[in-house]
């Protein structure tokens, strides 16, 4: 068993830079779909599409808990 004590929920999070805003999604448009570039960790330099809830703009740094999942593209019905 691990005897590690975690003091912060962001201890194992990875920093990512918002490089492009793709659009808004969600029932009321409360989620923004963005492209982010991973700044550290094993996926450093990788570009992902992610959904972010809350205010976001170009150049922001967001903390991602994991870098495996990628958001689906916004499509018109």
UniProtKB/Swiss-Prot annotation:
Domain of life: Archaea
Keyword annotations from UniProtKB, A to Z: Ribonucleoprotein, Ribosomal protein
GO biological process assignments: maturation of SSU-rRNA; ribosomal small subunit assembly; translation
GO molecular function, one term: structural constituent of ribosome
CDD domains assigned to the protein according to its UniProt record, in alphabetical order: S1_S28E
GO cellular component: cytosolic small ribosomal subunit
Family as reported in the entry's similarity comment: Belongs to the eukaryotic ribosomal protein eS28 family.
Protein name: Small ribosomal subunit protein eS28
Annotated organism of origin: Pyrobaculum islandicum (strain DSM 4184 / JCM 9189 / GEO3)
Gene designation: rps28e
